[in-house]
Every structure is written in structure tokens, then in C-alpha cells.
């Protein structure tokens, strides 16, 4: 009981201080549950909008850069160690659930064989509809549009358009080989 009360006071203080610091760019309903280790960062002219009754578990890390916008609907839950990197726009609907370790990037580095990886970024909007379940360790890439009532299975890497009412899952193929004594030695010695 005391712990819950302290967490409510902590969240109200955290929201109030961020509203003072960022002004209109930080539009967050007062009824939230932020873990003390949840990190919300706004850079430059970035904006953050969060609806009521949203929960952020331990280790969540959300960064909004430049003129980027992060908009999260109400009654949405982010499990442990979720990450969002928004340089353009990420929109998450209401009544969504994100499993542990979900990563969302609306940006990607530019690459060429001549110059290698550049710090310049390519960006594209991401939208996630209402009533979606994004399972553990899913990676959502720039330009992804997920409709309402979708389930994205654990470990998927998604991009592109996913229509409403879709279950997305990936197939992992495991191969098994028996190791005999000769193979063990070859493996250990590198022969």
C-alpha cells in the first residue's frame, strides 16, 4: 500500500517536472505508471503525447529526436526493456500490450559500400493500431503500419503494411546434428 502511494507521488512529480521543462511538447495525462528506471528523452523540438492509464515497466527507454513525435494512446502497457527511437513519428494506438524487449525504430542509418555506415538517417512513420499485442523481442522497422487487432508473434522483425486482424509469426528452423568424437576434436581444434 505504501509502495503504491509512493509510486503515485513519484509519477505525479515526474510528470509535473517534465511538463514544466518541455511545456506543450510534453502532453502526458497525469494518470500513468512509470517505473523509476523508465527513461523518456526529448531532444530539440521533439514532442511526446501519452494517453491516460499507460504503464511503463522496468528499463523502458523512449527517445524522441529532432522534430519527431511519439504518440501513445490510452490503456497501453509496455513490458520490461521496451525501446522506441522516434526521429519522425511513431503512433501507438490504445489498449495495446508490448512484451519484454520490443524495439521500435522509425529510422535507419544510410549505408554505401564506398563510405560505409553514415550518421545520416532515413526515416519513415510507424503506426500501430488499437488492441494490438506485440509479443516479446519483436523489432518494428521504419515505414511499418500495423492495423487494429493484430498480434505480432515473439521474435518477429516486421516492416511494411500489416492489415487489421492479422496474426504475424515467424518460423524458426532448428537443425540438430549428432556430435561424435571425431567431430568434437575437429570443432575444438578448428580442423
Ranges and model annotations:
Residues 114-117, 180-181:
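Short acidic, glycine/proline-rich loop/turn micro-motifs
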Residues 108-109:
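Extracellular/periplasm-exposed beta-strand and loop segments of Gram-negative cell-envelope proteins
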Amino acid at each position: 500500500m505504501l509502495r503504491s502511494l509512493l509510486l503515485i507521488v513519484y509519477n505525479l512529480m515526474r510528470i509535473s517536472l517534465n511538463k514544466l521543462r518541455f511545456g506543450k511538447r510534453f502532453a502526458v495525462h497525469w494518470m500513468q505508471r512509470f517505473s523509476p528506471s523508465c527513461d523518456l528523452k526529448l531532444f530539440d523540438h521533439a514532442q511526446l503525447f501519452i494517453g491516460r492509464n499507460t504503464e511503463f515497466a522496468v528499463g523502458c527507454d523512449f527517445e524522441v529526436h529532432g522534430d519527431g513525435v511519439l504518440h501513445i494512446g490510452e490503456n497501453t502497457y509496455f513490458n520490461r526493456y521496451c525501446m522506441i527511437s522516434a526521429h519522425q513519428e511513431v503512433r501507438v494506438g490504445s489498449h495495446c500490450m508490448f512484451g519484454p524487449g520490443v524495439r521500435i525504430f522509425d529510422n535507419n542509418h544510410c549505408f554505401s559500400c564506398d563510405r560505409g555506415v553514415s550518421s545520416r538517417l532515413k526515416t519513415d512513420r510507424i503506426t500501430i493500431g488499437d488492441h494490438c499485442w506485440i509479443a516479446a523481442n519483436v523489432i518494428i522497422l521504419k515505414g511499418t503500419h500495423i492495423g487494429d487487432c493484430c498480434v505480432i508473434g515473439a521474435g518477429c522483425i516486421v516492416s511494411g503494411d500489416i492489415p487489421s486482424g492479422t496474426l504475424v509469426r515467424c518460423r524458426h528452423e532448428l537443425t540438430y546434428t549428432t556430435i561424435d568424437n571425431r567431430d568434437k576434436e575437429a570443432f575444438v581444434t578448428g580442423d
